[in-house]
């Protein structure tokens, strides 16, 4: 595991390859989100914000996240997915589902226990038809360092909540993120 000091972590959060992309469309009380590139800490804040803004719509029945073009996922992204899945489960009429998940990405979810709280379909499943609405909104990838740190902290806390074994893996990450947030908040 890589050990970073608070200042290094902040630099890592701001200087990262920007080949990730999120698009979304809303049609017939369903939201279709497409991820291209890596599911990472960088893409997590806009995904979380977008879903949280939409999830309280009483007419919303489905949120689909198309993972067909997802090249991999980091722990922050998986923690955000777990948190969104748990949030969606508070509304019994709403289904939050990953579609077109590769076996490689499924294995990543299994490693951290996220598969236990997420509903998903693999790329190999026959009833996993591809639907991509014509008009899609490009989600803004902008978020400040504090927001990224907050989302990363909450995501890692969620990973520990769903599987206590994750505390061993992420204890120092959680502590580092908390220290960084305290510093950013002037504490």
Could you say what each language-model-derived stretch is?
Residues 1-69, 86-187:
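STAS-like cytosolic regulatory interaction modules
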